């Protein structure tokens, strides 16, 4: 059972589920039956797409020290079982998205699945370093789906807020990929840190990381408010400080500190948005 749970990538999808909840609460929703329906749909659809990613990438996972112990390369789950599991979860989540949430939220559920499972995993990841920019729209979709459920529509503030997720993803993934760039080279996956010189990679990733933090701060000043501002300030300060530190030091240790210190900023921002509406 634990192997099947790990296929869902719980350490990843919880943030996407939080984004859908933040979208719903920020859009005017409350703690009601629709919220619980949204939680179920978000869990099934994001978990299903994560499990499909495990299935599709089982060959490259076997070549990487970070992933070779995952259930498929280690033989704990067969490819056919993983595929059936992922498609069952995905189909259930997407179907319930339309049935329980409605047409527009259901459409965002479908788009989120397609951007991650198809655009990122199948089409782009092994072909171009731009893969992360295609898959990143899955993050926009989960927030917008929750917002559309509450509001009945999507407006400019919602779109702008959703891009906080989109901008956070590249620096977060690339900072992790920087540490394991040897793995990506060995597996033939064109992640940016595995393609360019280390110093240039550090400069690019730390700059994007700081820019994402500045954008999150601007968003909260424009559209947030209340006690949650302290959470945002904490996340922004930690992210910008460690980004500058990484840019100056240009070492793997400094990059890892930046990765660890800046990882919580998106969750803090989403929680602050929720608090601003409670």
Curated annotation (Swiss-Prot):
InterPro entries: Protohaem_IX_farnesylTrfase (IPR006369), UbiA_prenyltransferase (IPR000537), UbiA_prenylTrfase_CS (IPR030470), UbiA_sf (IPR044878). The keyword Coiled coil does not apply. One of its GO terms (cellular component) is plasma membrane. It is an enzyme of class 2 (transferase). The chain crosses the membrane at residues 12-32, 35-55, 76-96, 98-118, 129-149, 158-178, 199-221, 226-248, 255-275. It is a multi-pass membrane protein. It is found in: Cell membrane. Converts heme B (protoheme IX) to heme O by substitution of the vinyl group on carbon 2 of heme B porphyrin ring with a hydroxyethyl farnesyl side group. This is Protoheme IX farnesyltransferase 1. It comes from Pyrobaculum aerophilum (strain ATCC 51768 / DSM 7523 / JCM 9630 / CIP 104966 / NBRC 100827 / IM2). The gene is ctaB1.
């Amino acid at each position: 059972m634990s192997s099947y749970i790990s296929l869902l990538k719980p350490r990843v999808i919880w943030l996407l589920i939080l984004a859908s909840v933040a979208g719903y609460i920020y859009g005017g929703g409350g703690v009601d039956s629709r919220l619980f329906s949204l939680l179920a749909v978000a869990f099934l659809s994001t978990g299903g797409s994560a499990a499909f990613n495990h299935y599709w990438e089982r060959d490259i996972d076997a070549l990487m020290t970070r992933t070779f112990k995952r259930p498929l390369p280690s033989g704990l789950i067969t490819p056919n079982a993983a595929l059936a599991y992922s498609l069952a979860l995905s189909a259930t989540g997407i179907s319930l998205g339309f049935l329980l949430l409605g047409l527009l939220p259901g459409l965002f559920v479908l788009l989120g699945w397609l951007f991650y499972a198809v655009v990122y995993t199948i089409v782009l990841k092994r072909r171009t370093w731009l893969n992360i920019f295609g898959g990143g729209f899955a993050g926009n979709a989960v927030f917008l789906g929750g917002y559309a459920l509450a509001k009945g529509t999507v407006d400019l503030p919602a779109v702008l807020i959703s891009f906080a997720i989109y901008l956070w993803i590249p620096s977060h993934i690339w900072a992790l990929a920087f540490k394991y760039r040897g793995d990506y080279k060995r597996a033939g996956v064109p992640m940016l840190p595995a393609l360019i010189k280390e110093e240039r990679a550090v400069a690019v990733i730390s700059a994007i990381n700081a820019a994402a933090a500045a954008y999150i701060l601007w968003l909260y000043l424009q559209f947030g408010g209340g006690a949650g501002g302290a959470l945002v300030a904490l996340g922004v300060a930690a992210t910008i400080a460690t980004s500058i530190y990484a840019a100056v030091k240009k070492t793997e240790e400094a990059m890892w500190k930046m990765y660890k210190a800046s990882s919580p900023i998106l969750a803090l921002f989403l929680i602050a948005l929720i608090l601003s509406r409670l």
